[in-house]
Amino acid sequence: MEIKFTIKQVVAVGIGAALFVVIGMINIPTPVPNTSIQLQYAVQALLSIIFGPIIGLLVGLIGHAIKDSLAGYGLWWTWIIASGLFGLVVGLFRKYVRVINGVFDWKDILIFNLIQLLANALVWGVLAPLGDVVIYQEAAEKVFAQGIVAGIANGVSVAIAGTLLLLAYAGTQTRAGSLKKD
């Protein structure tokens, strides 16, 4: 199976990964060690909805890997993969959110937020901590606490910033049937 990317998709991955890194350097601490509120997932969610699951996956994987490399504490693959999976899961449900058609009403906002909250709960509350226990032999209590806090924090930040980004994006799109012949 050969996957071909358009120039637009390649640029979206590059810009998305760069934004993931830059925005990811802003860490708002939480009471749980090594866990902070992260704002870059709102941008990743936006790109996942606009460009689909593969672009969302790549933005998370590449962006998080570069961010970890620059941070100096090494690559934490379980969380890098979780970031990619967040974009993948959100992107899989893009057809239910109509921003491409210039529509992002209450129904779309509700659907988007249900999707992203479930994706955050899955990747941060289950997959990342489980990976830490299995691969890195981390203490389950510690990593599940980190994962739950990260999932809640990311869910709230995407609910606010992601919704605002999608509202702004939908406003730039022409609604189907909105043009009339004079």
From Swiss-Prot:
- Asked whether the keyword DNA damage is assigned, the reply is no
- Provide the disulphide bond pattern: none
Cellular component aspect of the GO annotation:
plasma membrane
Q: What keywords is this UniProt entry annotated with?
A: Cell membrane, Membrane, Transmembrane, Transmembrane helix
Task: Say where the protein is mainly found.
Answer: membrane
Q: Which residues cross the membrane?
A: 10-30, 46-66, 73-93, 109-129, 148-168
Q: Where in the cell is it found?
A: Cell membrane
The stretch of residues making up the signal peptide is none
Topology in the lipid bilayer? Multi-pass membrane protein
**Gene3D superfamilies registered for this protein in UniProt:** 1.10.1760.20
**Entry superkingdom:** Bacteria
What family is this?
Answer: Belongs to the UPF0397 family.
Q: Which PANTHER family match?
A: UPF0397 PROTEIN BC_2624-RELATED (PTHR37815), UPF0397 PROTEIN SPR0429 (PTHR37815:SF3)
NCBIfam families linked: PRK13661.1
| Protein's UniProt name | UPF0397 protein SPCG_0463
